[in-house]
């Protein structure tokens, strides 16, 4: 196996492009990339969505093959791209042999730019000879992430178009929140999984959408804990959210009849909402550009009078601009059944 990897690396090195340019990624790394980037290996699911939205013809494959219920919401030419595995995150199963077999012009990761990911990018780039850039996946950085990727992939106009759309959505929400004091904003709990007891602490990448939409994440210990945690039922009852968002139909099906969950304001007032998940989750799963659709949805949930949006129109427009699909009426209705608490079977 070691000999095979060495052979593949040696085979890869001579075909690096003669004409190259440099780009500074979100980690401050100066990376030499080809003048024309035609193929990209996505290091994980967030990166695959980002690349697909920006320049779908460059994506060499999905880290996980699309499921049947997701396919209608991706443009037809890209539904059958091969499964490539992933280089980063939980369950990373792609290996360097696979990357070298694909021979992409560029590797992209979208998410954290902490030292762990910088070290991985440097190591993979050194071992394969393939340039590897890191793009900051924090929600607030989304416009800049789009600009960086648009420039890297040779489609700066597309990057600017999407960045402007994101900034407009952020500005629309900010205008609403200017008139809503922090203490009057909805208390929101993200209920992950079939039991609803996995959640994301305030400030985590999994719950940025709550805070950006103007909700107060009740999973807040003052910043002592970040990321996903397992909550107890007692903690949820004490936090007493007035709004619960979830993407698991198993949880949604039973929460209103569960005597423990009935102790929360959210269940008592019927403010438990099920997020659509096709082709990607609206809340996270993964935390990428798909969250922009969830942000629009959640702003409408939390501030329906001020937002004054039409979810059907907003969804159709988003899927056209970002996922490059024209939804039929049937596809739109099937998608929004989730948001109405009726996940399609």
Task: Describe the predicted segments one by one.
Residues 46-101, 106-115, 218:
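A short, structured surface patch at a secondary-structure boundary
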Residues 219-220, 226-251:
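Ligand-binding pocket segment of bilobal, Venus flytrap-like solute-binding proteins
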Residues 206-226, 269-276:
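His/Asp/Glu-enriched short active-site or ligand-binding loop at hydrolase and phosphoryl-transfer sites
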Residues 15-20:
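Sec/Tat signal peptide C-region and signal peptidase I cleavage site
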Residues 21-23, 30, 119-198, 219-220, ...:
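Extracytoplasmic substrate-binding proteins
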Residues 41-43, 60-63, 106-110, 132-135, ...:
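Structural recognition of the beta-strand scaffold that forms the well-ordered cores
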Residues 26-28, 84-97, 223-233:
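Short helix-initiation/N-cap motifs at beta->coil->alpha
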Residues 3-14:
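Sec-dependent N-terminal signal peptides
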């Amino acid at each position: 196996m070691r000999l095979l990897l060495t052979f593949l690396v040696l085979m890869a090195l001579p075909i690096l492009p003669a004409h190259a340019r440099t780009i500074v990624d979100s980690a401050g790394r100066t990376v030499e990339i080809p003048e024309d980037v035609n193929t990209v290996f996505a290091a994980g699911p967030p990166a695959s969505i980002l690349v697909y939205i920006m320049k779908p013809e460059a994506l060499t494959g999905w880290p996980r093959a699309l499921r049947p219920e997701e396919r209608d919401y991706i443009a037809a030419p890209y539904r059958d791209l091969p499964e490539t595995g992933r280089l980063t995150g939980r369950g990373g199963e792609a290996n360097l042999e696979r990357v070298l077999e694909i021979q992409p012009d560029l590797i992209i990761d979208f998410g954290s730019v902490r030292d762990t990911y910088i070290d991985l990018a440097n190591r993979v780039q050194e071992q394969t000879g393939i340039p590897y850039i890191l793009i900051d996946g924090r929600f607030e950085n989304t416009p800049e992430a789009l600009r960086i990727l648009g420039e890297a992939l040779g489609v700066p106009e597309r990057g600017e178009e999407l960045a402007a759309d994101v900034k407009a959505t952020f500005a629309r929400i900010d205008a609403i929140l200017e008139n809503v004091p922090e203490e009057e904003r909805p208390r929101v709990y993200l209920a992950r999984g079939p039991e609803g007891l996995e959640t994301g602490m305030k400030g985590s990448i999994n719950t940025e959408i709550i805070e950006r939409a103007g909700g107060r994440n009740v999973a807040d210990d003052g910043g002592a804990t970040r990321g996903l945690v397992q909550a107890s039922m007692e903690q949820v009852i004490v936090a007493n959210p007035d709004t619960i968002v979830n993407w698991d139909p198993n949880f949604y099906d039973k929460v209103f009849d569960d005597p423990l969950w009935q102790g929360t304001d959210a269940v008592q007032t019927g403010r438990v909402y099920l997020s659509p998940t096709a082709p990607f989750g609206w809340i996270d799963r993964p935390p990428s550009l798909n969250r922009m659709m969830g942000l629009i949805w959640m702003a409408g949930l939390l501030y329906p009078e001020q937002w004054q949006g039409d979810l059907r129109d907003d969804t159709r427009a988003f899927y056209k601009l970002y996922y490059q699909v024209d939804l039929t009426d049937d596809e739109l209705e099937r998608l929004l059944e989730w948001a109405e608490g009726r996940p399609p079977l």
